Amino acid sequence: MRVELLYWDGDSNYMTARQRLVEVLTEDAFETPIQMIAVNSEADAELLAFPGSPTIRIDDVDIHPAGVGEIGLRLRSYPDDADHAGPLLEPVPGKRLIRRAVERARGWGHGREP
């Protein structure tokens, strides 16, 4: 399993995303290295099809494909992990979203609840 975290230096939240990713991989006993990929220019963003920071891809698949919009140096938002009547957004993916993506990549179905 290949795990990438793409980020833009203008994003102060990418290390929080990395920490959540590490926690999920550790909790699920995966010893998978995380490839950190800095996106430093609009040209890099185009080349990497970078939809914003932070972006986590597992085996080249974005963990939140519904959130992929315009390509460029910008910040992304993700649905929070809590169950609400309406959508609330966070600047980093929640552990539940990350875990479900990891489990799909491992062939474990739709993911388990925390």
Locations of the language-model features?
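Non-globular targeting/processing and membrane-anchoring segments
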Residues: 1-33, 37-51, 55-114
